Amino acid sequence: MIQQAIAKVLEGEDLTRAEAASVMTEIADGGATPAQSGAFLAALRMKGETVDEIAGAADVMRQRADRVRVDRDVFIDTCGTGGDGRHTFNISTTAAFVAAGAGVCVAKHGNRAVSSRSGSADVLAALGVNVDADKETVERCIEEVGIGFLFAVRLHPAFKAIAGVRRELGVRTIFNLLGPLANPAGARHQVLGVYEARWVPVLGGVLAALGAAHAFVVHGEGLDEIAVTGMTHVCEVRDGQVERYTIRPEDLGLPRRDAAELVGGDAAANARIVTDVLEGQAGGPRDAVLANAAAALVCAGAAKDLRDGVARAARSIDSGAAREKLRQLVAATTVPA
């Protein structure tokens, strides 16, 4: 199948959802050579990935994931694509703790760094979380603490083989978009940041096709986050309906911030910023977290709108609830000596 798919894509023709799924299955099963996999990914990138192609690939990633059981009707993910190249601190990871502190169940999917020096797994490890905890521990964390970390590299074993091909290609491919679409717990409520604004409507269409209950796809001022530095492009998906709009910090009751305030560093430096935010320190990092946590609360049904979400997120931080969720997650994932 992959040879025919390469030929079709090189002619500029789009694949159907089923065809894309067949190719991804072949890659996952080891039926495609590294050369074929690389050619397919590069050809698809040159043509431009469509909603159906991304949805078909995501179908297979979801099917092949090592499933994490969550016994809740509503739980969220705040996983973005990464790769925006702006080297901010880990905003969406911090927002996950704030959402959890506000009473929302979180199954946080993430990985090591893509373009920054600190991905969600890196900063969580620096904060003391055992990101390599086994699946049973992760499930227990979600159930008892209300937040758990789903480490992508451990829970998507079928796609380990493609990592080398992606590394050798050295360019973004469909896999850069797939991670946030393949939460191993099957989260249907999520905030998904994308590294370029052009992907906002595309990923919105994909989430609608995949059956998202309530989700936000966002890109703000070059970031795969809701921006407090300027305008954010939003695609809100709700039970198959897709709405596009833009928001500014002022719409959320937040001041406009300078991008330099949000720049992070390595995992240790970012862990200090996360800690400062969770301890209530005012400033740009806090406001960025409030904006993104607000969207998480809205998609979970825990806030009526983004302004209300900001207020509830602020209470989660200022009451100490968000910080306590981090402490509990560290304790729950740490193996006793």
From Swiss-Prot:
The record's section on Pfam families has: Glycos_trans_3N, Glycos_transf_3
Q: List residues binding Mg(2+) 1.
A: 92, 225
Q: What is its EC number?
A: 2.4.2.18
One Gene Ontology cellular component term attached to this UniProt record is: cytosol
Annotated residues that bind anthranilate 1 are located at 80, 111
Catalytic activity entry: N-(5-phospho-beta-D-ribosyl)anthranilate + diphosphate = 5-phospho-alpha-D-ribose 1-diphosphate + anthranilate
What InterPro entries does UniProt report for this protein, alphabetically?
Anthranilate_Pribosyl_Tfrase, Glycosyl_Trfase_fam3, Glycosyl_Trfase_fam3_N_dom, Glycosyl_Trfase_fam3_N_dom_sf, Nuc_phospho_transferase
Top-tier EC class: transferase
Q: How is the cofactor bound?
A: Binds 2 magnesium ions per monomer.
Record-level GO BP terms: L-tryptophan biosynthetic process
Q: Which Gene3D superfamilies does the UniProt entry name for this protein? A: Nucleoside phosphorylase/phosphoribosyltransferase catalytic domain, Transferase, Pyrimidine Nucleoside Phosphorylase, Chain C
Molecular function (Gene Ontology), one example: magnesium ion binding
Keywords assigned by UniProt? Answer: Amino-acid biosynthesis, Aromatic amino acid biosynthesis, Glycosyltransferase, Magnesium, Metal-binding, Transferase, Tryptophan biosynthesis
Q: Where does 5-phospho-alpha-D-ribose 1-diphosphate bind?
A: 80, 83-84, 88, 90-93, 108-116, 120
Known cofactor(s):
Mg(2+)
The residues the record assigns to binding anthranilate 2 are: 166
Q: Where does Mg(2+) 2 bind?
A: 224-225
Which pathway is it part of?
Amino-acid biosynthesis; L-tryptophan biosynthesis; L-tryptophan from chorismate: step 2/5
Which family does this protein fall into?
Belongs to the anthranilate phosphoribosyltransferase family.
Role summary: Catalyzes the transfer of the phosphoribosyl group of 5-phosphorylribose-1-pyrophosphate (PRPP) to anthranilate to yield N-(5'-phosphoribosyl)-anthranilate (PRA).
What does the annotation say about its assembly with partners?
Answer: Homodimer.
HAMAP family in alphabetical order: TrpD (MF_00211)
Report the protein name in the record.
Answer: Anthranilate phosphoribosyltransferase
Record gene name: trpD
